């Protein structure tokens, strides 16, 4: 079952109950954090496996750290170009 655990800026820490990952939310779609072409997906129980597979699976602690890191990088970039 999909669970949103935390949210910072445009990023969410999500879990399927066993695995954790961070995804980006833009324009109502959710994107894995990976290199290459990324296609937006609807967030749901049926898409969480693909998001975790493409974004990487982490322990909850490591995923929380990744969320903080990615959101901080986004904020720094936003402040720089603003």
Predicted regions and their residues:
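Negatively charged, low-complexity tracts enriched in Asp/Glu with abundant Ser/Thr
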Residues: 1-14, 76-80
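Short linear proline/tyrosine/threonine-rich motifs used for host-factor recruitment
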Residues: 12-14, 20-24, 30-32
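A structural microfeature
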Residues: 6, 23, 34-36
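Generic intrinsically disordered, low-complexity segments enriched for polar/acidic and small residues
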Residues: 8, 17, 27-28, 55, ...
């Amino acid at each position: 079952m999909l669970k949103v655990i935390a949210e910072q800026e445009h990023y969410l820490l999500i879990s399927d109950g066993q695995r954790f990952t961070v995804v980006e939310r833009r324009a109502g779609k959710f994107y894995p954090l990976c290199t290459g072409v990324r296609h937006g997906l609807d967030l749901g129980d049926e898409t969480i496996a693909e998001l975790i597979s493409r974004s990487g699976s982490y322990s909850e602690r490591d995923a929380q750290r990744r969320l903080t890191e990615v959101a901080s990088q986004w904020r720094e970039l936003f402040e720089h170009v603003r």
